[in-house]
């Protein structure tokens, strides 16, 4: 989850795998090397008091974990801020804004995860990753990411943020992602609205990589109609 300073659009680098003209991916989907987490006994009860004390290790005077606290938190748990596991964690905490955790979000989410310390959270990493492999959970995470990354005074995602978040969520699983990224790079679009965002996921799940089953009369957003037209021209040129 990119650390966001003063709620500006995140500076996450776009992730695209070795396609011509694309930037090198700086988004990691793996945790940094770290010492093995201390084994946590299943009988060790969750402590709300301990969880709150853990929160205050990172929170500022406003009782919010902000950019500096988030950076320290990521360092302590051994995860890069841009790692997709941070997005899944934010989803579990129901965090409203990228780069920030409120006390209420922390307590509610960590209680749900039964985590009151670094070691317990590290022991839940496999569970958090598993949410990405569940079709329903991934769809919820994907939809959550739109509002999470969006500037709250805007109804749409700026296109750079959209590209970065799409790279994080679909870059390793959608065969057409790098082509779609190229299309967005040269397109006239400067923002992506919620309907477009939702439909990109549906498109990635249902349309073949060769576009052979794309229904031109379907209820796809114009953005995707234009992408298909652009790609077909490239294929025949």
Swiss-Prot record:
PTM summary: Phosphorylation at Ser-41 is independent of cullin's interaction. Phosphorylated in response to both TICAM1 and MYD88 dependent Toll-like receptor (TLR) pathway activation. Phosphorylated in response to IL1B stimulation.
Residues the record lists as Phosphoserine modifications: 41
Give every DCUN1 domain span: 46-232
Q: Does the keyword Nucleus apply?
A: yes
Where in or outside the cell it occurs: the entry states:
Nucleus; Cytoplasm, Cytoskeleton, Spindle
Which keywords does this Swiss-Prot/TrEMBL entry list? Cytoplasm, Cytoskeleton, Nucleus, Phosphoprotein
* InterPro entries per the UniProt record, alphabetical: DCN-prot (IPR014764), DCN1-like_PONY (IPR042460), PONY_dom (IPR005176)
Look up the domain of life of the source. Answer: Eukaryota
CC terms in the record's Gene Ontology section: cytoplasm; nucleus; spindle; ubiquitin ligase complex
Q: Name one Pfam family in it.
A: Cullin_binding
Provide any one GO MF term from the record.
ubiquitin-like protein binding
Q: Name one GO biological process term.
A: protein neddylation
Primary location group: nucleus
What this protein is reported to do is described as: Contributes to the neddylation of all cullins by transferring NEDD8 from N-terminally acetylated NEDD8-conjugating E2s enzyme to different cullin C-terminal domain-RBX complexes which is necessary for the activation of cullin-RING E3 ubiquitin ligases (CRLs). May play a role in DNA damage response and may participate in cell proliferation and anchorage-independent cell growth.
Per UniProt, subunit arrangement is:
Part of a complex that contains DCUN1D5, CUL1 and RBX1; this interaction is bridged by CUL1. Interacts (via the DCUN1 domain) with the unneddylated cullins: interacts with CUL1, CUL2, CUL3, CUL4A, CUL4B and CUL5; these interactions promote the cullin neddylation and the identity of the cullin dictates the affinity of the interaction. Interacts (via DCUN1 domain) with UBE2M (N-terminally acetylated form) and probably with UBE2F (N-terminally acetylated form).
Entry comment, domain topic: The DCUN1 domain, also known as PONY domain, mediates the interaction with different cullins. The DCUN1 domain mediates the interaction with the N-terminally acetylated NEDD8-conjugating E2s enzyme leading to the NEDD8 transfer from N-terminally acetylated NEDD8-conjugating E2s enzyme to different cullin C-terminal domain-RBX complexes; the neddylation efficiency correlates with the DCUN1D5-cullin and DCUN1D5-E2 interaction affinities.
- Any idea what this protein is called? DCN1-like protein 5
Species = Rattus norvegicus
């Amino acid at each position: 989850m990119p650390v966001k300073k003063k709620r500006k659009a995140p500076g996450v680098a776009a992730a695209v795998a070795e396609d011509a003209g694309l930037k090198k991916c700086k988004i990691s989907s793996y945790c940094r090397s770290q010492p093995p987490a201390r084994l946590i006994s299943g009988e060790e009860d969750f402590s709300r008091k301990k969880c709150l004390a853990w929160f205050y290790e990172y929170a500022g005077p406003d009782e919010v974990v902000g950019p500096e606290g988030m950076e320290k938190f990521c360092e302590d748990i051994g995860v890069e801020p841009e790692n997709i596991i941070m997005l899944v964690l934010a989803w579990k905490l129901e965090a409203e804004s990228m780069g920030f955790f409120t006390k209420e979000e922390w307590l509610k989410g960590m209680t749900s995860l039964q985590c009151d310390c670094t070691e317990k959270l590290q022991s839940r990493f496999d569970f958090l990753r598993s949410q990405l492999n569940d079709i329903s959970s991934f769809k919820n995470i994907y939809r959550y990411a739109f509002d999470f990354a969006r500037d709250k005074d805007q109804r749409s995602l700026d296109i750079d943020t959209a590209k970065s978040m799409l790279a994080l969520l679909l870059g390793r699983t959608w065969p057409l992602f790098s082509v779609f990224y190229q299309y967005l790079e040269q397109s006239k679009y400067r923002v992506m609205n919620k309907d477009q965002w939702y439909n990109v996921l549906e498109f990635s799940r249902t349309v073949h990589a060769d576009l052979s089953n794309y229904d031109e009369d379907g209820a796809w957003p114009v953005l995707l109609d234009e992408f298909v037209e652009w790609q077909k021209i490239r294929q025949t040129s």
